[in-house]
């Protein structure tokens, strides 16, 4: 398509987004935005972007909200200021700026954007002030709830037949209402509001392909938060709601006369039908099968953890988007079961045995999910064949080996010889793959080192064969499907070893002759041609060890340690003794000397 035509069509899409609902133009042959794409043609009569315009007409609120939250990467007060600027700009464009504190409204569809941003701004202020100023934060949350209800009323009055527009508004407004009831400890009201919000999100899930990837991630986080809040509120409302799946809990908490039911029936009526198969599947959530053992879990905390795993598995979204949440749910269930098991005495042996089997089952699945997540991340990696990719593969296999070692130490596996043998085979296969990754890294630099690592990898594969030779069970898929991987690695490794052996031998042939040292050539006869270069006395593989000659030892024995033979020994200085001098007699006078004599 001509890029000018594409650009002009995009401008037409943007322009028609802000047309009023009663817009009519005979040249286009349409009466609202949802049918513009079907009539937009070029000079030859070809329809341009009909599907794209129709998809943009489906969603109105979600793209605005997700764009504001994700495109600009604002946080805290910056995002609140951004919403204030957006609200002020919309009011100026609609000529409804407030003067004197009197609010004004409009019948234009863009007025829904003002209500949406006002509600989101008040809600973000609640989140920002929640920990420091709770009373003020609750006032902002009530204000957000008021704007949300006004948004729902506006969408219903604007076009009661636009079901997607209404469901977008009710999903956002009921989420705020559920949060308000949650803060007020009104569990019944919070359960009903969160259920309506979740139902609206599930209906809109079929249309989510029209959003961008980053918008899908933001919307997925909002849905996950609704699911976790709904499960917690169900736990606080009573035991009758704790053992229900989120779908059954959601449908049982919504009154039949709710207006949202009519809109849901108009868009997707099948979502309101609960089949018997799902009812039966709920009975198997608390039944665990592990290594020919089947137990039923009855402890309430462990049961709730198992239902949380079931909720994440059945939540909307792809497997890749749910992988981290599923791993967190399994880890949480393992932690709860471990705590309950530690507090359980050995008096009730049956209960202790049941919890031990449950703990082994959960811990093993946590290890399994970690390995699968690491493998999926490595497969999705965009690194080209380089040293960085080889290092990443080596760290991946190190992580797999550590996780399998953790699984081997679990109480229910350490005494199971069959499961231990499978884990040992998986460890040996992972070590073989790690050696192959190291060999690939050394192949360009050192062929012999690469060949040595390949030989070691082959020895690990031989260990796998030895383990599986007497193994009668069908191996489980833990990190690898071990039998196909073993056959493939053996075939590739043989080719690689032959290639490296040939490359190493060619390198030895092309290598220049080594200049041997004198010690290395003493026991061989060399021709004159071989002796043309000077003898190498230093670069020898056999190094001389410095030692004192024998006559030095004899001389030291008879003469003592001599530092210098041409100099006389220095005479030791005698200690100086102090000699006391007699004091001189004073000269006497004439008469004194005469008398003295």
From Swiss-Prot:
It comes from the Eukaryota. One of its GO terms (biological process) is intracellular protein transport. InterPro entries: SRP68 (IPR026258), SRP68_N_sf (IPR038253). GO terms for cellular component: cytosol; nucleolus; signal recognition particle, endoplasmic reticulum targeting. The keyword Nucleus applies. It is found in: Cytoplasm; Nucleus, Nucleolus. One of its GO terms (molecular function) is endoplasmic reticulum signal peptide binding. Residues 566-597 are annotated as: Disordered. The keyword RNA-binding applies. Keywords: Cytoplasm, Nucleus, Ribonucleoprotein, RNA-binding, Signal recognition particle. Heterodimer with srp72. Srp68-srp72 heterodimer formation is stabilized by the presence of 7SL RNA. Component of a fungal signal recognition particle (SRP) complex that consists of a 7SL RNA molecule (scR1) and at least six protein subunits: srp72, srp68, srp54, sec65, srp21 and srp14. Belongs to the SRP68 family. Component of the signal recognition particle (SRP) complex, a ribonucleoprotein complex that mediates the cotranslational targeting of secretory and membrane proteins to the endoplasmic reticulum (ER). The SRP complex interacts with the signal sequence in nascent secretory and membrane proteins and directs them to the membrane of the ER. The SRP complex targets the ribosome-nascent chain complex to the SRP receptor (SR), which is anchored in the ER, where SR compaction and GTPase rearrangement drive cotranslational protein translocation into the ER. This is Signal recognition particle subunit srp68. It comes from Schizosaccharomyces pombe (strain 972 / ATCC 24843).
């Amino acid at each position: 398509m001509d890029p000018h035509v594409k650009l002009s069509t995009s401008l037409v899409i943007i322009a028609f987004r802000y047309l009023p609902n009663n817009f009519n133009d005979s040249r286009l042959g349409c009466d609202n935005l949802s049918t513009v794409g079907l009539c937009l043609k070029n000079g030859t009569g070809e329809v341009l972007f009909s599907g794209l315009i129709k998809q943009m007409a489906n969603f109105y609120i979600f793209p605005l909200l997700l764009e504001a939250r994700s495109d600009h990467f604002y946080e805290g007060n910056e995002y609140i200021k951004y919403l204030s600027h957006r609200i002020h700009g919309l009011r100026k464009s609609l000529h409804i700026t407030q003067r004197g504190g009197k609010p004004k409204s409009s019948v234009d569809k863009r007025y829904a954007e003002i209500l949406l941003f006002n509600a989101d701004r008040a809600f973000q202020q609640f989140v920002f002030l929640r920990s420091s100023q709770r009373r003020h934060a609750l006032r902002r949350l009530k204000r957000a709830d008021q704007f949300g209800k006004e948004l729902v009323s506006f969408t219903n009055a604007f076009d009661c037949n636009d079901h997607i527009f209404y469901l977008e508004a009710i999903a956002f407004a009921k989420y705020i209402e559920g949060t308000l009831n949650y803060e007020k400890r009104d569990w019944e009201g919070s359960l009903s509001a969160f259920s309506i919000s979740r139902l609206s999100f599930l209906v809109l899930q079929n249309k989510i392909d029209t959003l961008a990837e980053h918008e899908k991630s933001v919307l997925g986080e909002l849905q996950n938060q609704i699911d976790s809040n709904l499960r917690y509120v169900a736990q606080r409302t009573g035991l009758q709601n704790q053992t229900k799946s989120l779908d059954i809990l959601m449908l049982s908490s919504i009154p039949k006369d709710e207006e949202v039911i009519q809109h849901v029936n108009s868009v997707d009526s099948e979502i309101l039908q609960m089949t018997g198969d799902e009812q039966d599947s709920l009975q198997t959530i608390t039944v665990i099968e592990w290594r020919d053992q089947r137990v039923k879990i009855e402890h309430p905390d462990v049961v709730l953890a198992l239902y949380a795993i079931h909720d994440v598995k059945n939540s909307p979204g792809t497997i890749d988007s749910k992988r981290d949440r599923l791993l967190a749910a399994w880890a949480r269930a393992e932690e709860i079961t471990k705590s309950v098991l530690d507090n359980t005495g050995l008096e009730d042996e049956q209960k202790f045995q049941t919890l031990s089997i449950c703990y082994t089952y959960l811990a093993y699945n946590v290890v399994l999910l970690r390995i699968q997540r690491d493998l999926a991340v490595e497969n999705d990696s965009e690194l080209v064949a380089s040293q960085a990719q080889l290092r990443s593969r080596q760290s991946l296999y190190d992580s797999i080996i550590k996780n399998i070692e953790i699984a081997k130490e679990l109480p229910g596996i350490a005494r199971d010889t069959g499961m231990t043998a499978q884990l040992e085979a998986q460890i040996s296969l992972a070590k073989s793959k790690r050696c192959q990754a190291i060999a690939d890294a050394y192949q360009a630099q050192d062929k012999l080192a690469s060949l040595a690592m390949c030989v070691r990898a082959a020895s690990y594969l031989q260990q796998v064969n030895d383990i599986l030779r007497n193994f009668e069970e069908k191996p489980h898929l833990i990190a690898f499907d071990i039998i196909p991987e073993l056959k493939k690695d053996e075939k590739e490794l043989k080719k690689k070893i032959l290639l490296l052996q040939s490359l190493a031998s060619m390198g030895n042939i092309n290598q220049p002759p080594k200049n041997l040292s004198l010690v290395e050539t003493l026991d061989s006869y060399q021709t004159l041609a071989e002796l043309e270069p000077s003898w190498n006395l230093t670069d020898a593989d056999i190094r001389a060890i410095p030692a004192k000659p024998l006559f030095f030892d004899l001389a030291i024995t008879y003469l003592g340690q001599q530092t210098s033979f041409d100099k006389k020994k220095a005479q030791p200085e005698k200690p100086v003794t102090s000699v006391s001098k007699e004091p001189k007699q004073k000269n006497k006078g004439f008469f004194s000397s005469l008398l003295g004599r």
